[in-house]
Amino acid sequence: MSRIGFAPVSVPSGVTVTINGQNVEVKGPKGTLNTDIPAPIAVAQEGDEIVVSRPDDHRKNRSLHGLSRSLVNNMVVGVTEGYTTKMEIFGVGYRVQLKGKDLEFSLGYSHPILIKADEGITFAVDGNTKFSISGIDKQKVGQIAANIRGLRKDDPYKGKGIRYEGEQVRRKVGKTGK
């Protein structure tokens, strides 16, 4: 049984947390995030810690308890440190470049693909094949990274495509010729 929900979230100095009913707002040096916590879960601030509690041990409340604690923790880490996802491109002729604040991909299609930077998201390009996505919202950074990866998923036969840095792709053996 997971005990993630019972661990209090420590609030570092320079971060202010405002709890208004089910709405939690976290302000820090990098920005402001807010989210709504599901109804049966209670959030309270005790000193420099945020405590998340549940009314009973029903299955749904147990799952929402851990989720709510993780959401609050992700917001605190986001406004203090931020989140970065690094990705790389493999394949002949596949490349990425920065166009203003947006990313432009050449992935073997007949047209370049432009990914616009959402509010609070920044892109950085290192060479033609490596880039990173940064922001304070962990969900938004992860979703944009997943959308970009979906533009050209890794091919298990040739190893071409977009992948997360350090991701290992299981290669397959092609058909044997006669």
From Swiss-Prot:
Keyword set includes Nucleotide-binding: no
Keyword Transmembrane helix: no
A GO term, aspect molecular function: rRNA binding
Keywords: Ribonucleoprotein, Ribosomal protein, RNA-binding, rRNA-binding
InterPro entries named in the record: Ribosomal_uL6-like, Ribosomal_uL6-like_a/b-dom_sf, Ribosomal_uL6_a/b-dom, Ribosomal_uL6_bac-type
GO BP terms: cytoplasmic translation
One GO term describing the cellular component: cytosolic large ribosomal subunit
Superkingdom of origin: Bacteria
Function: This protein binds to the 23S rRNA, and is important in its secondary structure. It is located near the subunit interface in the base of the L7/L12 stalk, and near the tRNA binding site of the peptidyltransferase center.
Quaternary structure and partners: Part of the 50S ribosomal subunit.
Protein family according to the UniProt entry: Belongs to the universal ribosomal protein uL6 family.
Protein name: Large ribosomal subunit protein uL6
Species, as recorded: Corynebacterium urealyticum (strain ATCC 43042 / DSM 7109)
